Amino acid sequence: MPFARFEKLEPEKRERLLDAAAREFAAYGYAGASINRILEAARFSKGAAYYYVADKADLFAATVAWCGEQITLLDGALDLTALTAGTYWPTFTRLRREPLLRSQQRPWLFGALKAVEQLDPTTLRDGPLAGYVARFQAYVLGMLRRGQALGVVRADLPEELLLAWLQALDRSGDDWLLAHWDALTPDDIARLADHTSAAMRRAVAPDDHERA
């Protein structure tokens, strides 16, 4: 992650750098992104930028964390213990829908987050993003296990398989939305996001709940 002094950078300059980086990573992915283009768009010199971040990987980690905060990808106020069998799936659906709607005017925020998927497992585990990835995985796993405890997510299959199913549907839905973003209204985004959530529910619901 960036050096501690990055947080002392003037908020307007910090946001300008992170927004430029988000646009670049969303457009070109991590591998194709150019730190020179980012710095030019943000009106930063290399000397100034490297005073705050060590390299492109460091800047990417900071950008991902910032994008996640901007769209509230992880809901810090979520109380898993308060969820019931009746509120679990509506809450799940809302938690998927709302970050997408918050991205509606700035789709590059979501696009930059999607660029994380291009990194190999070793980089995700050991690189600057390791802490953020661990928090995200714990968030998702906590949600899955709460659903199992409530009896609304099946518990007869390995967690890894259930997560793989959910991830595949989530990625497919998000990729389609991003590819068609400019033609979609907020209502379209919400409706399609909810359809994907419904498919995710059907994929992991216990057999006796599949038609619920």
Question: Where on the chain are the PLM-derived regions?
Answer:
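N-terminal intrinsically disordered/low-complexity leader segments
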Residues: 1-12, 208-212
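Helix-turn-helix
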Residues: 16, 24-58, 62
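Short coil/turn segments at alpha/beta junctions that flank glycine-rich nucleotide-binding fingerprints
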Residues: 27-31, 106, 150
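Hydrophobic alpha-helical connector segments
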Residues: 62, 76-106, 159-166, 190-193
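Short, basic, alpha-helical segments at the C-terminal edge of helix-turn-helix-like DNA-binding modules
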Residues: 65-71
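Short secondary-structure transition hinges
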Residues: 94-141, 160-163
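Hydrophobic/aromatic-rich alpha-helical bundle segments in the mid-to-C-terminal region
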Residues: 110-115, 126, 130, 148-196, ...
